[in-house]
Design a protein with these regions (language model features):
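Conserved acidic donor-binding segment of nucleotide-sugar-dependent glycosyltransferases
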Residues: 227, 280-281, 285-292, 301-307
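Short alpha-helical donor nucleotide-sugar binding micro-motif in glycosyltransferases
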Residues: 236-240
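Aromatic "clamp/platform" in nucleotide-sugar-dependent glycosyltransferases that forms part
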Residues: 248
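Short glycine/serine-rich donor-binding loops of glycosyltransferases
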Residues: 253-256, 274
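Short hydrophobic beta-strand element within catalytic cores of glycosyltransferases
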Residues: 265-268
């Protein structure tokens, strides 16, 4: 098949990682795959095409990257499948000619919540594009709010990258790891409040933050790791026995899954997307959305109960590494497109 993805960028951040991994794996399965990416200026698109700039974080990337000044429906390549990957790319897909391929919408979050005008974003979900979503929560939203069917393909963890790293826990310190992000809906404020409540009774527990950038203000992280390369993330996840996810809403949530694959016990809000892997009392402890007191209580349980912590970590690791697999996911993606 000839397959075209419209990707917002090729950085490792956010949902682009899944988009480009699928593009690479489909190309490795013998398909002719093009990823069309907008540049801010026409001259940038020109030089990036000349230099064949692609995602250098995927060794030997097999798909073709085509840089453009903007997504022009009339200039999209002829293909069998054309895939929008965010709400801003949907208009180009919807208006593309028939020879651009069967039209799909790869949905990785309910973007109406935080990304763009809600009415405009919602209008994209109502369009008659075949939908692929990354969680059961998103499938429910598509069905209940828009009367639209969707195929669920949970994004797997890369087991070659994310696994327990021997020697990472070089001391007996009990570390809680949390992603730091400027988006309010990532729940940093709620996470800090929950951690502060636990530290009143357990001051020995250490809060470890990580993120693309350091926080602008002084926050109570005992450690902070800035913009770690992906090969070092497994070490950080493995170093911290507990992963705290205070996000209000997630399309899926890859960092919690990566931490689980590295042997961390997960404590999380019920953020929607986590329901495919965070099974309360089995693979994680789950608190009601934005209920800081409940999140603190769950965190304290994992801090004080070593047997519970180890059981959640073991079951969580087994679940995310056996239930979701990249080879199977690429095969299913291929089947949906065909």
């Amino acid at each position: 098949m000839k397959i075209t993805f419209l990707a917002p960028h090729i950085r490792i951040a956010g949902g682009a990682r899944a988009i480009l991994t699928y593009a690479d794996r489909l190309a490795r399965r013998g398909h002719d795959v093009t990823v069309v990416v907008p540049a801010k200026r026409p001259w940038r698109a020109f030089w990036r095409n000349v230099r064949r700039r692609g995602p250098d974080w995927i060794p030997g990337f097999r798909a073709r990257v085509r840089w453009v000044a903007g997504w022009d429906p009339a200039r999209l390549p002829k293909a069998d499948a054309l895939i929008a990957t965010a709400w801003r790319s949907v208009d180009a897909v919807a208006r593309a000619p028939a020879n651009a391929g069967t039209k799909f919408y790869f949905v990785q979050h309910y973007e109406s919540l935080y990304h763009g005008d809600p009415a405009k974003v919602d209008s994209t979900y109502a369009l008659p594009l075949k939908k692929i979503v990354i969680s059961s929560w998103l499938q429910d939203i598509m069905r209940e709010r828009f009367g639209s069917a969707a195929e669920v393909l949970v994004t797997p963890v890369d087991r070659d990258l994310f696994h327990p790293v021997e020697g990472a826990r070089s001391d007996d310190a009990l570390r809680v790891l949390m992603l730091h992000h400027d988006y309010p809906w990532k729940g940093v404020r709620e996470g800090l409040e929950a951690m502060a409540a636990v530290k009143v009774r357990h001051p020995e527990v250490l809060l470890v933050g990580f993120g693309v950038k350091r926080p602008r203000e002084a926050l109570p992280y005992e450690e902070f790791h800035e913009n770690l390369p992906q090969e070092r993330l497994a070490w950080l996840y493995s170093r911290c026995p507990i992963y705290l996810c205070p996000s209000w809403d997630e399309g899926l949530g890859m960092p919690p899954m990566e931490a689980m694959a590295c042997g961390a016990a997960l404590v999380t809000f019920d953020n929607g997307g986590c329901r495919d892997y965070a099974l309360d009392g089995e693979t994680a402890l789950v608190a009601p959305r934005r209920d800081v007191a409940a999140l603190a209580q769950a965190l304290e349980r994992v801090v004080t109960d070593r047997l519970l912590r180890d059981r959640l970590a073991e079951r969580g690791r087994d679940f995310v590494t056996s239930r979701f697999d990249w080879d199977r996911a690429a095969e299913r993606f291929e089947g949906v497109l065909s």
